C-alpha cells in the first residue's frame, strides 16, 4: 500500500533543516497539506513560505493546530514541546527518513550514499537524468544552483535522493539504485565503531532489489573491500582504477573546469565504450570521480553520450561546494562546506590545480568531538594551502574537549612541517589578516559547516573596503 493523499495536515518540526525542507516541498507539490516550525528564520524557511507553506518560528504546542501527522528529524529532542503535544494527542510520529522512504515508493529511486561527495553526486545524477529527458524528482542535502532549491518535482518515473548515513536511517530507503562514493570513520557516536559503519553500507547496497544495482567507487579502499563482500546483487564499479567498469582518465584542469575521458566496459559482453573530452565546470579529481559515478548511473539508464556530455557541461554546481562568493582586487573568495579532513584535503587539492597564485585556507572546525577524534588527520590535511587561518571551534552545542582547540591544531600543523599556520582569534580580524597576505591571482577558501559561510559571503566587500575600492 502506498501513502494515500488523504493523510491530513502534515506538520514538520524543524522544517528549515536541509533534509526536512526538501521532503516538505515535495509533499506540498504532490498536493498534501504541509506546515512546520523551526527555531529561527532562514533562507530555507523563506523559500518554503514563498511556495505557500506556513512556517512558525519557535516551538510551541499550539503550532500543531489540526495536524494529523508529525514529521521529526533525529535533531529534535524528546523534550520539544511540539513533540510532547503530538504524543499526548496520539498523533503518528514519522521520522524524516521514513517519510522520505514513503515518497520514494512513488518512483523508481536512486539513493546516493557515502561519507563525502553525496550532495554533489546527487546533483550530478539529477542533472544527467534531466539532460536525458527523464524529468526526475530530486531531494538533495544541499541547494542545487540550477534549481535554487534542494528539491525538484519531476513528472518522470525516477527519483534521486541523498542518503544520509549519519543516524543509520538510510537503510530504510527503498532504493533501486544505490551509489557509494566512499566510506570513512564518521558518525561513530551513533555507530559505536567503524565495523558497524561498514556493515551499514553493505546492507545499503544489498537492500536494492534483484533488478536494481549498486554503483561503487573502486578508488576508495574501504569501498573496494566492500565490493568483494556484496552477494547476489549487481554492482557497477567506477573510478580511476584500471579495473573499474566505468573508468575516468586523462584528467586536465583548465582554470575552474575539468576535462577528462571515460571508458565504460561491459562485463558480460566485453564491449568498451569511450567518451572523450568530457567537460565539467568544476575543478578537482574528486569532482571528476563524482561525475563518473553519475555517468555510470546515467549510462545504465540508457542516457546517450551526447546528453551526458551536454548535462555535464551545463552543471551549475551546488551551493557551498567551492562556490565563488566574489572577487576583490584580483583575489577570489570561495565558500565550501568541507569540515572533514578528507573533504578539506580534496577541496584544497582542487584549488591548487585551478589557482595560479597562492591558496589561503580559512577553516572553522565544526564540533569538538570531530576535531578530537580526527585531530591527527586535521593536522595533515592542509598541505595544499600556503597559509592557514584557523578560527575558534564552532561548538554546535557541544562542550569543549581538552586538547581539541584551534590553538592546539595550529601547533600540530606547524609540528607536522607546515610553514604558515595561524590562529584567527576574532572573526572581525579576518579581512585585515587576509588583506595583509593576499595578492592578485590568489584564492581564499573558507571551509566549515558552521557560520563561516556568512564570513565567506561578506569577505569580498570587506576586502574592497580595506583597499578603499568599491564597485
Swiss-Prot record:
Any one GO molecular function term: ATP binding
Catalytic activity: UDP-N-acetyl-alpha-D-muramate + L-alanine + ATP = UDP-N-acetyl-alpha-D-muramoyl-L-alanine + ADP + phosphate + H(+)
Keywords tagged on the record: ATP-binding, Cell cycle, Cell division, Cell shape, Cell wall biogenesis/degradation, Cytoplasm, Ligase, Nucleotide-binding, Peptidoglycan synthesis
Pathway: Cell wall biogenesis; peptidoglycan biosynthesis
Compartments, record wording: Cytoplasm
Coiled-coil intervals: none
GO biological process entries: cell division; cell wall organization; peptidoglycan biosynthetic process; regulation of cell shape
Main location per the UniProt record: cytoplasm
NCBIfam families: murC (TIGR01082)
Family the entry assigns: Belongs to the MurCDEF family.
Role of this protein: Cell wall formation.
Protein name: UDP-N-acetylmuramate--L-alanine ligase
Natural source organism: Agrobacterium fabrum (strain C58 / ATCC 33970) (Agrobacterium tumefaciens (strain C58))
Amino acid at each position: 500500500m502506498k501513502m494515500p493523499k488523504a493523510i491530513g495536515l502534515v506538520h514538520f518540526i524543524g522544517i528549515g533543516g536541509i533534509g526536512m525542507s526538501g521532503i516538505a516541498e515535495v509533499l506540498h507539490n504532490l498536493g498534501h497539506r504541509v506546515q512546520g516550525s523551526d527555531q529561527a528564520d532562514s533562507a530555507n524557511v523563506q523559500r518554503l513560505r514563498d511556495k505557500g507553506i506556513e512556517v512558525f518560528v519557535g516551538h510551541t504546542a499550539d503550532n500543531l493546530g489540526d495536524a494529523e501527522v508529525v514529521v521529526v528529524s533525529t535533531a529534535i529532542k524528546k523534550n520539544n514541546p511540539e513533540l510532547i503535544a503530538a504524543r499526548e494527542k496520539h498523533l503518528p510520529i514519522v521520522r524524516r527518513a521514513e517519510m522520505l522512504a514513503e515518497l520514494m515508493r512513488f518512483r523508481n529511486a536512486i539513493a546516493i550514499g557515502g561519507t563525502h561527495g553525496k550532495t554533489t553526486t546527487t546533483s550530478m545524477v539529477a542533472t544527467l537524468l534531466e539532460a536525458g529527458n527523464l524529468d526526475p524528482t530530486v531531494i538533495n542535502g544541499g541547494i542545487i544552483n540550477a534549481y535554487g532549491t534542494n528539491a525538484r518535482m519531476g513528472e518522470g518515473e525516477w527519483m534521486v535522493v541523498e542518503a544520509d548515513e549519519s543516524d543509520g536511517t538510510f537503510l530504510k530507503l527503498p532504493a533501486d539504485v544505490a551509489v557509494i562514493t566512499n566510506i570513512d570513520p564518521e558518525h561513530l557516536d551513533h555507530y559505536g565503531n567503524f565495523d558497524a559503519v561498514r556493515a551499514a553500507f553493505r546492507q545499503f547496497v544489498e537492500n536494492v532489489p534483484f533488478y536494481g544495482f549498486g554503483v561503487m567507487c573502486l578508488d576508495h579502499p574501504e569501498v573496494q573491500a566492500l565490493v568483494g563482500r556484496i552477494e547476489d546483487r549487481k554492482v557497477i564499479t567506477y573510478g580511476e582504477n584500471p579495473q573499474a567498469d566505468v573508468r575516468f582518465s586523462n584528467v586536465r584542469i583548465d582554470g575552474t573546469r575539468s576535462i577528462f575521458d571515460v571508458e565504460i566496459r561491459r562485463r558480460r559482453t566485453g564491449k568498451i565504450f569511450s567518451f572523450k573530452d568530457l567537460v565539467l565546470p568544476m575543478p578537482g579529481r574528486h569532482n571528476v570521480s563524482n561525475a563518473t559515478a553519475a555517468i555510470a548511473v546515467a549510462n545504465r539508464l540508457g542516457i546517450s553520450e551526447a546528453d551526458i556530455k551536454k548535462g555535464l557541461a551545463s552543471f551549475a554546481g551546488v551551493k557551498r561546494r567551492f562556490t565563488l562568493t566574489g572577487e576583490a582586487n584580483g583575489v577570489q573568495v570561495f565558500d565550501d562546506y568541507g569540515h572533514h579532513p578528507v573533504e578539506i584535503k580534496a577541496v584544497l587539492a582542487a584549488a591548487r590545480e585551478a589557482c595560479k597564485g597562492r591558496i589561503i585556507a580559512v577553516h572553522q572546525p565544526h564540533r569538538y568531538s570531530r576535531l578530537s577524534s580526527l585531530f591527527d588527520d586535521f593536522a595533515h590535511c592542509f598541505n595544499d594551502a600556503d597559509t592557514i587561518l584557523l578560527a575558534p571551534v564552532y561548538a554546535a552545542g557541544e562542550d569543549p574537549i581538552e586538547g581539541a582547540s584551534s590553538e592546539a591544531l595550529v601547533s600540530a600543523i606547524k609540528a607536522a612541517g607546515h610553514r604558515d599556520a595561524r590562529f584567527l582569534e576574532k572573526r572581525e580580524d579576518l579581512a585585515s589578516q587576509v588583506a595583509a597576505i593576499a595578492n592578485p591571482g590568489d584564492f581564499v577558501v573558507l571551509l566549515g559547516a558552521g557560520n563561516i559561510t556568512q564570513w565567506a559571503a561578506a569577505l569580498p566587500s570587506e576586502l574592497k573596503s580595506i583597499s578603499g575600492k568599491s564597485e
